[in-house]
Amino acid sequence: MKRAVVVFSGGQDSTTCLAQARHQYDEVHCVTFDYGQRHRAEIDVARALALKLGTRAHKVLDVTLLNELAVSSLTRDSIPVPDYEPNADGIPNTFVPGRNILFLTLAAIYAYQVKAEAVITGVCETDFSGYPDCRDEFVKALNHAVNLGMAKDIRFETPLMWIDKAETWALADYWGQLDLVREETLTCYNGIKGDGCGHCAACNLRANGLNHYLSNKAAVMAAMKQKTGLR
């Protein structure tokens, strides 16, 4: 039996990964993390989506220690979430240091226990928000370290790594979940479901990608299939 664990926030990217995993694996588990995030409404959204999409199990893990260690606008109400700046340089203040290191490591430990062969994460470096822990080289390096540390071959899968946001919408549509992802996921840094606040970087990337996909469906779908190998 093929099993996978999805690092699941209830946002656009991880929900698209979950929709695909349900078709590619016999048994899918989800792991969601409560780190005291500003947009922690995503936890309830993740619970509802995991139930709706039919996962084998959904674990919500308390990692609020991260909130004490990692200072970010996503972990401190006193630090405002910045409006989207398309030409901004450097790492944004929404970056939570160590977040994906911790999430992927804990997901791999869970995968070890349930005998899953893969941990799936929705990170992407094509049009990402400047986070160093979304890069392909980081995921591969951590995957190697985790496998050495557990003497186990658990594969970190990144289905969205080389596709952009428009193509991510196409992937959701390919699996018949475009409306669900559009209406029921929570991507917004300010914790607003669906189209979100419309001001933060997450909302702008999401909206721009959706608009591009809806305006160029055939071309974007073809590009997504070419990059992912789907037919």
UniProtKB/Swiss-Prot annotation:
Pathway given in the UniProt record: Purine metabolism; 7-cyano-7-deazaguanine biosynthesis
Alphabetical list of Pfam families matching this protein: QueC (PF06508)
Enzyme class: ligase
Highest taxon in the source lineage: Bacteria
Signal peptide residues on this chain, from the entry's feature table: none
Entries under Gene3D superfamilies matching the protein: HUPs
Binding site for ATP: F8, S9, G10, G11, Q12, D13, S14, T15, T16, C17, L18
UniProt keyword annotations, A-Z: ATP-binding, Ligase, Metal-binding, Nucleotide-binding, Queuosine biosynthesis, Zinc
Gene Ontology molecular functions: ATP binding; ligase activity, forming carbon-nitrogen bonds; zinc ion binding
Alphabetized InterPro entries for the sequence: QueC, Rossmann-like_a/b/a_fold
Chain sites annotated for binding Zn(2+): C188, C197, C200, C203
GO BP, sorted A to Z: queuosine biosynthetic process
Catalytic activity: 7-carboxy-7-deazaguanine + NH4(+) + ATP = 7-cyano-7-deazaguanine + ADP + phosphate + H2O + H(+)
Cofactor(s) listed: Zn(2+)
Cofactor remark: Binds 1 zinc ion per subunit.
Record-listed E.C. numbers: 6.3.4.20
Family, as annotated: Belongs to the QueC family.
PANTHER family in the cross-refs: 7-CYANO-7-DEAZAGUANINE SYNTHASE
Stated role: Catalyzes the ATP-dependent conversion of 7-carboxy-7-deazaguanine (CDG) to 7-cyano-7-deazaguanine (preQ(0)).
Entries under NCBIfam families matching the protein: 7-cyano-7-deazaguanine synthase QueC, PRK11106.1
Protein name (record): 7-cyano-7-deazaguanine synthase
Organism (species): Salmonella heidelberg (strain SL476)
Record lineage: Bacteria, Pseudomonadati, Pseudomonadota, Gammaproteobacteria, Enterobacterales
Gene (name only): queC
